[in-house]
UniProtKB/Swiss-Prot annotation:
SUPFAM superfamilies xrefs: CsrA-like
Keyword Repressor: yes
Any GO molecular function: mRNA 5'-UTR binding
Subcellular location: Cytoplasm
Record region (Disordered): 50-71
Record carries keyword Repressor: yes
Keywords carried by this UniProt record: Activator, Cytoplasm, Repressor, RNA-binding, Translation regulation
Gene3D superfamilies per record: Translational regulator CsrA
Family: Belongs to the CsrA/RsmA family.
Source organism, top-level taxon: Bacteria
Encoding gene per record: csrA
Descriptive protein name: Translational regulator CsrA
Pfam families on file: CsrA
GO BP terms, alphabetized: mRNA catabolic process; negative regulation of translational initiation; positive regulation of translational initiation; regulation of carbohydrate metabolic process
């Protein structure tokens, strides 16, 4: 794994077509912007895993705090 240090407003490039820019840092959260061609999917890891499981026909149960809120 390549580990990089970037400041707010700085960008890193992945190949020729994908850029990742640090938009802000607040506490332990980092806001990033991803610029990629339309044919490149960009997802948060948990969303990517859900999509992958749905494609395989294996839908995992919602994690605590996610999904419908029973009342």
């Amino acid at each position: 794994m390549l580990i990089l240090t970037r400041r707010v407003g700085e960008t890193l490039m992945i190949g020729d077509d994908v850029s990742v820019t640090v938009l802000g840092v607040k506490g332990n959260q980092v806001r990033i912007g991803v610029n990629a061609p339309r044919d490149v999917s960009v997802h948060r890891e948990e969303i990517y895993e859900r999509i992958r499981h749905e494609k395989d026909g294996d839908v995992p149960e919602a994690a605590p705090g996610q999904g419908a809120d029973p009342q």
